[in-house]
């Protein structure tokens, strides 16, 4: 079996291993970054974390308010926004969400009785956010931040999370909403 005859699942596996490292996958189809299964993996992990935290009470309190991106999307308005502007909003939201998850991890580390399954999901979320950051770089989202129009962008709308459940709900909704909409459009247009 030659290199070019490898099944698609093998390319997906190689890309998932290489994506967090920012490494290219030799011989992989060039649009693998746009394969919806890659994003679906992170969506599944985020939803799983949200479900785990729904059942816990006091051990899942953050004991502070952490600022997170507002994940509400007006689909009609979103479709009218240029892809570059969408990239700015998604990149800013991802940066804020990454900070929030890291803050949540610090709160958990300082907890006297950490909820063990929560630590696993925090670690997965941090790893997933790093991989998603790499995915957005591959789509050129980071370059949109340096465009002249980025300075005139509307400020990022935010809300606060006071529980791990709300933090993971925001994470899940962000991936399912703005991130999925942006990556879908950027991949369709070929903006990489």
From Swiss-Prot:
Glycans are attached at residues 51, 65, 110, 152. One of its GO terms (molecular function) is protein kinase activator activity. Keywords: Disulfide bond, Erythrocyte maturation, Glycoprotein, Hormone, Secreted, Signal. InterPro entries: 4_helix_cytokine-like_core, EPO/TPO_CS, EPO_TPO, Erythroptn. It comes from the Eukaryota. Residues 1-27 form the signal peptide. One of its GO terms (biological process) is erythropoietin-mediated signaling pathway. Disulfide bonds join 34-187, 56-60. It is found in: Secreted. One of its GO terms (cellular component) is extracellular space. Produced by kidney or liver of adult mammals and by liver of fetal or neonatal mammals. Its main location: secreted. The keyword Magnesium does not apply. Hormone involved in the regulation of erythrocyte proliferation and differentiation and the maintenance of a physiological level of circulating erythrocyte mass. Binds to EPOR leading to EPOR dimerization and JAK2 activation thereby activating specific downstream effectors, including STAT1 and STAT3. Belongs to the EPO/TPO family. This is Erythropoietin. It comes from Macaca mulatta.
